[in-house]
Design a protein with these regions (language model features):
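Non-catalytic all-alpha helical scaffold/repeat segments
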Residues: 1-215
Length: 215
């Protein structure tokens, strides 16, 4: 426990060690063992980050969000559903830290769904369950209390070159997402690349996508 010192007067020491940990690969055993430190870090906002840590080329919000997203994507025990919510994900999504929420969504898109290795074989090898990701997206869209930037982070959930989701379903989800994001999207290449696919199966939702995105 001395590796990650806690206490209001030891933030600099804590963040020095914590930053180094987050910059490395996530291991299931450590994720479980260090649960209390993830919980502590989730409760800290950027206003508490030491100035020196803000200038180093590593985003602490992105770092913890990436670890949580990896755990959610790969570990069966880490769930976020109506009935079952892992304590850390419950804390992330019941709070108002939009930066961490946005980075969580964005990494699932960048690192999993739009990963260059994204195939059925790769998902199986990495223990990624597409239905789990779909259910999460639906659950987030059912909420009305999140900031538009969080919904805009779903842009990376549209893989521009590989068929991850059913096009009809994806067109519907993206139309709803753009309504929640006020027409903003943090990466539009995937969506724009798939407009012709959307139009063939769901022209009504495709028009909504265009309307929300353009106007």
């Amino acid at each position: 426990k001395e590796i990650f010192p806690k206490g209001i007067n030891r933030y600099e020491d804590f963040f020095a060690a914590w930053q180094g940990y987050l910059a490395n690969t996530l291991y299931k055993e450590l994720f479980v063992a260090l649960k209390e430190y993830y919980d502590l870090a989730l409760g800290l906002t950027s206003t508490l980050y030491p100035e020196r840590r803000k200038t180093i080329d590593f985003d602490l919000d992105e770092g913890i969000a990436t670890h949580l997203a990896l755990a959610f994507a790969h570990f069966d025990e880490v769930q976020y559903t109506d009935k079952t919510k892992h304590p850390l994900l419950k804390k992330l999504w019941s709070g108002g830290d939009a930066e961490k929420q946005k980075e969580f969504v964005s990494f699932l898109g960048r690192g999993i769904i739009s990963n260059s290795n994204a195939t059925d074989e790769w998902f199986k090898k990495e223990n990624v369950k597409i239905d789990k990701l779909k259910a999460f997206w639906i659950l987030i869209l059912d909420r009305d209390d999140l900031l538009p930037d969080v919904y805009a982070a779903f842009g990376f959930w549209v893989n521009y070159s590989k068929d991850i989701f059913d096009y009809n379903w994806l067109a519907d989800m993206m139309a709803k997402t753009l309504e929640k994001s006020d027409g903003k999207i943090n990466w539009d290449y995937g969506v724009l690349s798939r407009l012709s696919n959307f139009a063939k199966v769901n022209p009504a939702k495709t028009l909504i996508i265009l309307e929300k995105y353009l106007f």
